[in-house]
Amino acid sequence: MKDVLDEIVAWKRIEVERSKALLPPSELYRMVERQIAEEQSAPPSMREALLASPIGIIAEFKRRSPSKGWINEQARAETVPLAYERNGAAAVSILTDEKYFGGRDEFVTEARRAGLTIPVLYKNFVVDEYQLFQARRCGASAALLIAADLTLSECRILLRLAHELQLEVLLEMHDERELDYVELEPDMCGVNNRNLGTFITDVRHSFDLAQRLPDTMCKVSESGISSPDTVAQLREEVSADSLLVRTS
């Protein structure tokens, strides 16, 4: 079976280089530095919002996926995330990958301009520091780093840069081989119940891996959460602080 993650990451490296040709890194970096200097405060903390919430729902804005095709091609970033906020979501995850998930960086900007105040997770396949500047530029509070995409050293460098840019990091893991990445002390650790190589989902991943994470870690269970019973079990058995739920 074709490994979808490898395909996506290979394309992402090409895509980033094309973006750099359109907007050189030095120019983007200056824009972000100026933006940070002019801001009244840092973006709202996603970690704090999740820990303060009784349920900790991260509602996801996603138009399509490689496994399901188009979910809602007409979903609008100006309205859907605001509806999530009104209905009690602690944070919003916005897919910004265009080729495979139908997303754009502008979706984050549009949601912010429409009045979204809760934290936004920039959900993409980050393999280059340039993408973290893109995330900060469009108004995200946190960025997703996927352990399977990065060496430990690469992840350490990107995490440090994210913090310099006032971005928190949700570090996503899928199997026990990636538990070493916890030593980097990310702001949040996510256990993805979906295998990103095959897109097969098994919620047992959260039960198995989350129990091996430090008690002090903010734990997020991602994908395959479709029933109240699963929600209750995750929060009770593995002390999951947050649940990432696809709702669009």
Q: Which stretches of residues belong to each language-model region?
A:
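Alpha-helix-loop-beta-strand connector modules within alpha/beta enzyme cores
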Residues: Q40-I55, G102-F125, A147, R156-L171, ...
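Catalytic cores of alpha/beta
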Residues: V127-G139, D175-E185, S221-V245
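Active-site beta-loop-alpha junctions enriched in small/polar residues
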Residues: W11, K62-R64, D97, F125, ...
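Glycine/Thr-rich beta-alpha phosphate-binding loop at enzyme active sites
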Residues: R63, S67-A75, V80-G102, Y181-A210, ...
